[in-house]
Amino acid sequence: VYACRQTGFAMLAETNPQEVMDLSPVAHLAAIEGKVPFINFFDGFRTSHEIQKIEKWDYADLKEMCNMDAVKAFREHALNPEHPAMRGSHENGDVFFQHREACNSVYEALPAVVKKYMGKINEKLGTNYDLFNYYGAEDADRVIIAMGSICDVAEEVIDYLTAKGEKVGLIKVRLYRPWVSSALLDVIPKTAKKIAVLDRTKEPGALGDPLYLDVATTLREAGLNDIVLTAVSYTHLTLPKKA
């Protein structure tokens, strides 16, 4: 899914089947109101094929959250043979980039739309979904940043270590694109000294993998240069065998 990050699509990540059920409406509702297409993604096979009991949405609840004015505007903007319009005409580079810059305001406004619908879902379900979610000790000095199914495993590790008095935590990335640095900074514990960023990919020849580079840029721009940042690239994690 990292290959899609430059397409202009917003990208929303889920960790497990229940989160897929809970947050999929956010992608649809925010796409309609925010006027930006969404990629709603989760781990292929690890999450998509997982057998798990989940709480399903009541369509009446979804209807209450739907902005019908935005739906009307969305339909009016769609291609319609009764109201033909020309799109995708040729542009030279100078005009194309002016159009791309003109889109900035839409992407800057989108996180607030996503956050609004997450808030509506939290009210319905009693959850606490946010652009980034923190889990662990309030005074953690070591933090993992990750997205996808690894987060469920990481939560179990956090529970095990905090029960032993370790000061550790996890930040789960929900809205991957647009990347919101301020939202990430809000959930990083003030006591954090070391951060490990987990990327489930490998880009040979790159300075770092995608999520790591986003986090590194956020910390650099915020002047948090004292935090030790570590990149971790993985496909799957295994426990060491006992001797």
Outline where the language-model segments fall:
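Short acidic, glycine/serine/threonine-rich loops at helix termini
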Residues: 22-25, 49-56, 155-157, 182-183, ...
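Conserved thiamine diphosphate
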Residues: 1-44, 68, 217, 221-233
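Redox- and metal-dependent alpha/beta enzyme cores, enriched for Fe-S-associated oxidoreductases
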Residues: 139-166, 179-184
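Conserved small/polar residues in nucleotide/adenosyl-binding loops
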Residues: 235-241
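Metallocofactor- and cofactor-centric catalytic cores in central/energy metabolism, strongly enriched
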Residues: 172-176, 180-181, 212-221
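A general structural motif
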Residues: 113-129, 146-154, 173-181
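Conformationally flexible catalytic loops at phosphate/diphosphate-handling active centers
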Residues: 38-133
